[in-house]
């Protein structure tokens, strides 16, 4: 453990998933890249902007591959490692799979931070990988000006039980497993307006592994028609992507959305990130926010780090699903439903 107090958020300009390249800008960049033709065994590639790639090996096993890394979103090194790992592991769970191996991705400023920080970050990650019943099998590191850490994760899933963001069915209920608000709360932390202890509920949520699949019976798992995790593009952006991929529309009630107690207050204080604005720009033509106040709209665009899963589930089992999920995810809630395609991809109502 590090012997002196280090505030990692003060060593970077932006942190967590709020540091993502804006979605609209990224799409324009990727349009200029000529990618090779997809192999027939690829069940999911980058075309749908899903959470991970899936490569079918045989009729019983498919490979799930993803990676995620970012700059510090919290001050404590070990907690940063825990959150970075939980965030990377989440993409495998969002596809219905289970992680098996993880490799570390580390950029570290050797000239400005003590090496003990690496130990703490790696230990935090190792603890979460073990919690996911996966193996930490190595990685790669470089000396850099800014600390960055994350994981490349490989998992497995039955090809017949893959979740994607493209399978939502009209009539499904939408379930969100974690509260919103990590973007604005951690913005307050970076501005040194609060201490970690003041927003511990959100920090613990970010460090919570998204293994919702482990709390589902086989029957419940089969009733998940689509899934994605809510991260840097916010509920608005990731919800829009799911609706577009599934060629449906989502109707979501703001009053049903779980949120951290201080989130709206922090937004009112102006604790916004660049991602709040880029997410609003990204989704402005595709979502409806009629009747919502500006602070409520900010929360929809709030960039989540290691946010919850958004599940599109048969309405016949949605109540049972929520009850099962609340064994771990206490805030799991039905927040809306899937509609036939409308003019807007996502319709947010009060």
Curated annotation (Swiss-Prot):
Q: Where is the active site?
A: 17
Residues annotated as binding ATP are 20, 48-50, 68, 91, 139-141
What top-tier enzyme class does this entry carry?
transferase
Cofactor binding annotation:
Binds 1 Mg(2+) ion per monomer.
GO MF: ATP binding; magnesium ion binding; selenide, water dikinase activity
| Keywords, alphabetical | ATP-binding, Kinase, Magnesium, Metal-binding, Nucleotide-binding, Selenium, Transferase
Record Pfam families? AIRS, AIRS_C
This chain belongs to the protein called Selenide, water dikinase
Which gene specifies this protein's sequence? selD
């Amino acid at each position: 453990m590090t012997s002196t107090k280090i505030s990692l958020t003060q060593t970077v300009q932006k942190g967590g998933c709020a540091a993502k390249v804006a979605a609209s800008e990224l799409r324009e960049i990727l349009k200029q890249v000529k990618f090779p033709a997809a192999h027939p065994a690829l069940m999911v590639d980058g075309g749908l902007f899903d959470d991970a790639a899936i490569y079918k090996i045989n009729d019983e096993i498919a490979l799930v591959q993803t990676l995620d890394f970012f700059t510090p979103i919290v001050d404590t090194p070990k907690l940063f490692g825990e959150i970075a790992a939980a965030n990377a592991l989440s993409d495998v769970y969002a596809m219905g799979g289970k992680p098996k191996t993880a490799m570390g991705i580390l950029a570290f400023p050797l000239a400005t931070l003590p090496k003990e920080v690496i130990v703490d970050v790696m230990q935090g990650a190792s603890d979460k990988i073990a919690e996911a019943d996966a193996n930490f099998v190595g990685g790669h590191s470089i000396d850099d000006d800014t600390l960055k850490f994350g994981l490349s994760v490989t998992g497995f899933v039955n090809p017949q039980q893959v979740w994607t963001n493209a399978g939502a069915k009209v009539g499904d209920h939408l379930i969100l497993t974690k509260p919103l608000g990590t973007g604005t709360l951690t913005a307050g932390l970076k501005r040194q307006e609060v201490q970690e202890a003041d927003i511990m509920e959100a920090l613990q949520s970010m460090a919570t592994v998204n293994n919702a699949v482990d709390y589902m019976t086989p029957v419940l798992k089969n009733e998940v028609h689509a899934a994605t995790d809510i991260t840097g593009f916010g509920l608005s952006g990731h919800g829009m992507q799911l609706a577009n991929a599934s060629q449906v529309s989502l109707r979501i009630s703001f009053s049903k959305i779980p949120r951290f107690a201080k989130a709206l207050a922090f937004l009112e204080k102006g604790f916004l990130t660049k991602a709040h604005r880029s997410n609003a720009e990204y989704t402005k033509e595709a979502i409806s926010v009629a009747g919502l106040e500006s602070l409520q709209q900010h929360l929809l665009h709030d960039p989540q780090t290691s946010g919850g899963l958004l599940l599109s589930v048969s309405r016949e089992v949605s109540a049972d699903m929520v009850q099962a999920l609340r064994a771990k995810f206490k805030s799991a809630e039905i927040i809306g439903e899937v509609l036939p395609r409308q003019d807007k991809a996502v319709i947010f109502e009060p």
